[in-house]
């Protein structure tokens, strides 16, 4: 096992030990009432990622916040008048919010909630890798630390990655892609670009297997298969729709199918069911069941976000995201490059994990 794999394994284990505890309905209602009062008192708005606990997603909507992907969460915070953003998600999402909203206080229920893609792309090793291939344009996925973004030429989300890499390919540029090898491989195959892949992956999406998906499809032959491109190639090849979180949600709403097999984090079901309550959603099978599966289609770091630590941080202000000014300025350059690219082509930039 490599040093990076060791780090991911240890962090994953720690995350499972600190997952938010289950609450009784009475406890949940009490905490929600406290949080609603604190949000007003602290001039704060709650933004939650699609993969967080449905209780948090519902609370964000009830209190005038939003449920979205990480970039849309940050942009919502930029447009909202609140002076404090409470970000329910994982750390790189809080950093992205801070990069785009430097004048605001950005809090998270816990700063320990990270991501296997982030852990799997440490800036020192990644920078050395880039230096070894200095003739290549560096493209990084939004699911990375501020430090890795600062080393990049472009930041991309899964919904715009194909367009940007195709643009670079047409310009004759060779590319370094990081960190997700599956998404990178998908983009490479679709565009034909010369792409050198960093060896990273999402522990949730890597668990989906084509054999289990094929077996499930036999049980539900009329179901459309929706797959996030962070999944292995064999799973992606079985998809009726390959897309970002937002694109998969829109597919459930717009497609005529009554049943959908969904290969992404199960937290997304809250929004899918809200948008299309008449549709039947089926979890795509992971590599195992119960104690034998690694993620069981739910990110252990997302599960660290809960009502209790959310309430506690609104009181203590201790879990604040800090991005140093010089790092923020460097990380903003490739991020802004993506936003400008999107604006020039009048595209909607949504859909990192």
Swiss-Prot record:
GO terms for biological process: 'de novo' NAD biosynthetic process from L-aspartate. It catalyses: iminosuccinate + dihydroxyacetone phosphate = quinolinate + phosphate + 2 H2O + H(+). GO terms for molecular function: 4 iron, 4 sulfur cluster binding; metal ion binding; quinolinate synthetase A activity. Binds 1 [4Fe-4S] cluster per subunit. Iminosuccinate binds at residues 49, 70, 141-143, 158, 228-230, 245. Its cofactor is [4Fe-4S] cluster. Pathway: Cofactor biosynthesis; NAD(+) biosynthesis; quinolinate from iminoaspartate: step 1/1. It is found in: Cytoplasm. One of its GO terms (cellular component) is cytosol. Pfam families: NadA. [4Fe-4S] cluster binds at residues 115, 202, 299. PANTHER family: QUINOLINATE SYNTHASE, CHLOROPLASTIC (PTHR30573:SF0), QUINOLINATE SYNTHETASE A (PTHR30573). Belongs to the quinolinate synthase family. Type 1 subfamily. Catalyzes the condensation of iminoaspartate with dihydroxyacetone phosphate to form quinolinate. This is Quinolinate synthase. It comes from Hahella chejuensis (strain KCTC 2396). The gene is nadA.
């Amino acid at each position: 096992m490599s040093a990076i794999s060791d780090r991911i394994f240890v962090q994953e284990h720690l995350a499972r030990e600190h997952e938010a505890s289950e609450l009784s309905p009475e406890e949940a209602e009490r905490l929600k009432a406290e949080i609603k009062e604190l949000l007003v008192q602290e001039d704060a708005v709650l933004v939650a990622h699609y993969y967080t606990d449905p209780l948090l997603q519902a609370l964000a909507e009830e209190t005038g916040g939003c449920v979205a992907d990480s970039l849309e969460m940050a942009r919502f915070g930029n447009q909202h008048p609140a002076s404090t953003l409470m970000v329910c998600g994982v750390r790189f999402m809080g950093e992205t919010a801070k990069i785009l909203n430097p004048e605001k206080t950005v809090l998270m229920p816990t700063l320990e909630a990270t991501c296997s893609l982030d852990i799997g792309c440490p800036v020192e090793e990644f920078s050395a890798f880039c230096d070894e291939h200095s003739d290549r344009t560096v493209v990084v996925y939004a699911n990375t630390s501020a430090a890795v973004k600062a080393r990049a030429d472009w930041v991309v989300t899964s919904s715009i990655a194909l367009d940007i890499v195709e643009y670079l390919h047409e310009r004759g540029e060779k590319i370094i892609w990081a960190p997700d090898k599956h998404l990178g491989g998908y983009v490479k195959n679709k565009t034909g670009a010369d792409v050198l892949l960093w060896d990273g992956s999402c522990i949730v999406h890597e668990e989906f297997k084509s054999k289990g998906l094929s077996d499930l499809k036999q049980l539900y032959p009329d179901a459309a298969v929706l797959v996030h491109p962070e999944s292995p190639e064999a799973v992606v090849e079985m998809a009726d729709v390959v897309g970002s979180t937002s694109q998969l949600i829109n597919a459930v709403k717009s497609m005529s199918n009554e049943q959908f097999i969904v290969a992404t984090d199960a937290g997304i079901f809250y929004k899918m069911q809200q948008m299309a309550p008449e549709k039947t959603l089926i979890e795509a099978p992971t590599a195992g069941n119960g104690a034998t599966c690694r993620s069981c289609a739910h990110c252990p770091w997302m599960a660290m976000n809960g009502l209790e630590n959310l309430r506690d941080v609104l009181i203590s202000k201790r879990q604040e995201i800090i991005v140093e000014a010089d790092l923020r300025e460097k990380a903003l350059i490739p991020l802004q490059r993506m936003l400008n690219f999107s604006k020039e082509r009048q595209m909607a930039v949504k859909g990192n994990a």
